[in-house]
Amino acid sequence: MICEREINVVEKKLYHKQDIRLNYYEIKNDLQPLVLIHAQGVDAVSFGNVWERLSKRYHIYSVDCYGHGESLHDAARYNIVDISKAVGSFIEDVVKEKVYLLGHSSGGLIAAYIASATELCSCLILEDPPFFSSQGERRKGTFNYIDLSTICHRFINQSESRDFVLYYFSNQYAWNFFPEKSREKVKQKLTGMAAEYRKKHPDKNLKVMFWPKYALSGFQGMNNYDPLFGEAFYNDSFHSAVLHEDILKNIKCRTVFMKAQTNVSEEGILLAALSEEDLGKTAGLIADCKIVRFECGHGIHIEKPKEFVECLLSL
């Protein structure tokens, strides 16, 4: 069913129960509930560009994970079990019915855990989650590990900089994609521009002239990101020793896997969430899994919003 009436406003709310604290955004209507779980580093507003269009078909709930946005910041809780329990409790107490559950990247790992451990999910949508590639020794050969995870690890073990947003921008792996001859000059200039913007607008999302818009989307909400969350992926404590295989084989609901492009660097670094082999293994373990491919990078809802929305409206 597609709702053709005027779209309701986005409401920002807080779910607080005992030691659970989740900030979330809601677009109310009487349609199928859709809970959105964002990737690490950004916040729930990462999905803001598709909220309105999705609300024609769904009652939208977009949640800040622990360590992000205005949800609980407690490093001891930055793991798949605690976050999944919190979101599960939110669904039980706030939504109060079975949901369509969508998770992007690390949010996809969380969504999958909820679907495997509870009866709260009637349809699971996985937006390019890093199954198998982000766990154990495999994680060390991925873009996320050499980029965000390692930068978080270095940031919390230094004392010169307090601005993680600027620290990440100046140390990100993306500089390696610039021509070696001009790399340092360009890096110095753009980092200077970023520093100036941070000085003038410390509470705003980072903007840097000439930096690609889709790349800047990765800084959405980074002001409130706790680098200790990235440390949990650096040392693999995020998974709480729960194997991806055990999560996937217990998912019984209908599942859609949104797969972005797969790229590998000359050095063998996986410049993607997961490999084609990982994808095959993932889909093979889920009882009912449909794969939908997108010709874009990891942020499908950012780079291909029209196709992303069309996929969800067709479910």
Identify the residue ranges that each predicted region occupies.
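Conserved HGGG/HGGXW glycine-rich cap/lid loop of the alpha/beta-hydrolase fold
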Residues: 20, 26-73
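Active-site loop/oxyanion-hole signature of alpha/beta-hydrolase fold enzymes
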Residues: 65-102, 106, 113, 137-138, ...
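Short glycine-enriched nucleophile-adjacent loop
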Residues: 108-119, 124
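Flexible "cap/lid" loop of the alpha/beta hydrolase fold
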Residues: 125-183
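Hydrophobic, aromatic-rich cap/lid helix
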Residues: 185-246, 262
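Conserved loop-alpha-helix segment in the C-terminal half of the alpha/beta-hydrolase fold
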Residues: 247-295
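Catalytic histidine-centered segment of alpha/beta-hydrolase-like enzymes
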Residues: 293-305
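Post-His helix in hydrolase/transferase enzymes
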Residues: 302-314
